[in-house]
Regions:
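Phospho-regulated scaffold assembly regions enriched in serine/threonine/proline and acidic residues
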Residues: 1-107
Length: 107
């Protein structure tokens, strides 16, 4: 049986410390995408989501493990198919994860 999820991307903000020094996503917005089958998620699809939001190039792609107590220890980089498999497992277990893309600012 297929498991469907809604990808959630954080855009327009930045990762930085709050007043207590805890790393948070600051001043961004949340963008959701159409429902996808977890088994069909792949790196090119995740790259396509970033491009559709105006981020044609990025330096790193991350997902936030939903059970993490903070972003400093909860961000997981996506580089390989194995990383995507860990993402899929978390999506099935938790129903949702947030995606973050490191990118250069266009000036």
């Amino acid at each position: 049986m297929a498991t469907f999820v809604v990808p959630v991307l954080n855009v327009g903000g930045m990762l930085g410390p709050d007043k207590n020094g805890v790393i948070k996503y600051i001043d961004g917005q949340v963008q959701t995408f159409d429902t996808v089958d977890v088994d069909m998620i792949c790196i090119p699809d995740l790259e396509g989501m970033a491009k559709s939001l105006g981020y044609p190039k990025y330096t790193a792609m991350h997902w936030l493990h939903p059970t993490a107590t903070n972003m400093e220890f909860g961000l997981r980089e996506i580089k390989t198919d194995s990383d995507v498999n860990q993402l899929r497992i978390s999506l099935v277990e938790n129903g949702c994860v947030d995606f973050h893309y490191e990118h250069f600012l266009a000036l």
